Each structure stands twice: as C-alpha cells, then as structure tokens.
Amino acid sequence: MKVLVVGGGAAGLMAAGAALRQGHEVTVLEHMEKPAQKILVTGKGRCNVTNDCTAEEFLHHVRTNPRFLFSSLGAFPPAKTMELFESLGVELKVERGRRVFPVSDKAEEIRQALLRYTDGADIIHDGAKKLLL
C-alpha cells in the first residue's frame, strides 16, 4: 500500500517509520526545507524525548481530555519510545522530573535518529503553506 504522511515533524517521521516497517511505500510531504527542524529547539536544544513513566502515570498528568491519548499511549507507551531511540543508536538518560534526554544533550541526535528510522521513505520538500487533498 502507498502511504502519504503530511508533515515531516517528529510525529510525521514516527508515522512514516512505522509504515515503512509494515512494508508500505511511504512519501512524506514537508513544507520546511529540512524535516524535523523544530526538534532542534525543543528542550533548550536538548530534546526532551519522553518521560520515564507508565502510560497510566503519563495520562494522570494530562489536564485536557486524557481519554483522547489513551489508545495511542496504550499501544506505544513511553518505554517503547525509549526502546525505539535506543535501537536507533541513541543513548538516553533520565533527569529530574523523569524527563528523558539523549546523553549527548543534542537534539540533532534525535533528529538524525528519526531520519534513519525513515530511511527508505520519499521525503519531499513542497514549500506549501496549505495543502488540499
């Protein structure tokens, strides 16, 4: 099956990588010049990957409509996020507040890991501000 992912941010690249691993042909449309650029400014340039807690603990701290996230966090809890990045060669550390960062303290390492995860996807820079499907 052909899969189109609109947006090459962290979530879009995660979706693209998952689709690739299911054997789909994947195209990612991204309006920025390079995918996952915003990752570089998260966590003061270090990228807070996730929190080291269970899905239930995570949802307990969501103030607005936690039920919306229930199924996705049940299927892909924080521990799986950590396992994924470690499998992509990123060493992780847990800091105050159970926040998880790359040991390197460089968000670029997370960005590069996501690009490796999507290796095989067609990533197209379209420059579009609006997209009609």
What are these regions (language model features)?
Residues 46-94:
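Glycine-rich active-site loop/strand segments that organize a redox cofactor
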Residues 22, 88, 117:
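Conserved dinucleotide-binding and phosphotransfer motif residues
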Residues 69-79, 96-116, 124:
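Short beta-strand to alpha-helix junction loop
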